[in-house]
Regions:
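Conserved ANL (AMP-binding/adenylate-forming) active-site segment centered on the GW(Y/F)…HTG consensus within
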Residues: 43
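Conserved Helicase C-terminal RecA-like lobe
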Residues: 12-33, 54-156
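Non-catalytic, charged helical/coil tracts that couple and regulate nucleotide-powered enzyme cores
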Residues: 1-18, 35, 39-40
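Short secondary-structure junctions and interdomain/linker hinges
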Residues: 4, 8, 47, 72-78
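Short, polar/flexible loop-turn hinges at active-site or ligand-entry regions and domain interfaces
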Residues: 46-55
Length: 156
């Protein structure tokens, strides 16, 4: 069975590729994200205060960390939040607005996409959460933007 991807170093393939230009942009939470973040943090803080760090399992602290990371990426990553926030959405426009206001990062991505589309550039978007890519996929479909998505999933 032949591999789908061949790994090659830049030096082996192409001389004209410009050097990587990486920029870190700090993105604030939306008001909605801030509310959920404080809720998750406060809930876990009470557990820590009650039982102390010695009796808390590392897995519980890791779970809190993952929940906070999900909250910072997009609220729809949190269990039950998507259903809660979209319950009253009657139109695609309502859903689109809720999708954006649930993530400061997606709001910034929306601005970047508009800018890069005007300049006829392409983008690569990476995420550690497959579900985040699903959310971005929904956003792109709603905007009518063509895309390709690569994940570790295998289809029959």
């Amino acid at each position: 069975m032949k591999p789908h991807f061949l790994r090659r170093l830049k030096e082996e393939v192409e001389d004209s590729i410009p050097p990587l230009n990486e920029t870190v942009v700090e993105v604030g939470l939306t008001n909605l994200q801030n509310t959920y973040y404080k809720g998750i943090y406060g809930e876990n803080r009470m557990v820590l205060a009650k039982f102390g760090t010695n009796s808390i399992k590392t897995s519980q602290l890791n779970n809190m960390d993952v929940q906070l990371r999900k909250c910072c990426n997009h609220l729809f990553l949190l269990k039950g939040v998507e259903e809660e926030l979209t319950r009253d959405c009657k139109t695609d426009e309502d859903l689109y607005n809720k999708l954006l206001e649930s993530s400061g990062k997606l709001m910034l991505l929306d601005k970047f996409i508009e800018k890069f589309r005007k300049e006829n550039h392409k983008m690569l978007i990476f995420s550690q959460f497959k579900r985040m890519l699903d959310i971005i996929e929904l956003y792109l479909r709603m905007k009518g933007i063509s895309y390709e998505k690569l994940t570790g999933s295998v289809k029959n």
